[in-house]
Amino acid sequence: MYAIIETGGKQIKVEEGQEIYIEKIDAQEGETVTFDKVLFVGGETVKIGNPTVEGATVTAKVQKHGRQKKIIVFKYKAKKNYRRKQGHRQPYTKVVIEKINA
């Protein structure tokens, strides 16, 4: 069984036991979180939401919080001596999907 959930402005396909990286959420490590925005549930029977599936939830356990690799944003204009360098590290949360309730 799998499901498509929406979290952090993104849609993610998840299965039970899968480890996924999502946008940072406000939860402590080891805490259980519930995702209510389930858009699709697949398996032997298929449930499609309009826009979400009624009564369907996905529970997950927070493993850790972290920051991704640094990306460099560099602005440059030729012949004008204009250079701007800025770095950014996006925070994330690693969760393990425990159960899909459909």
Curated annotation (Swiss-Prot):
Key words, A-Z: Ribonucleoprotein, Ribosomal protein, RNA-binding, rRNA-binding
GO biological process: translation
Taxonomic superkingdom: Bacteria
GO MF annotation: an example: structural constituent of ribosome
Function: This protein binds to 23S rRNA in the presence of protein L20.
Family membership: Belongs to the bacterial ribosomal protein bL21 family.
Name assigned to this protein: Large ribosomal subunit protein bL21
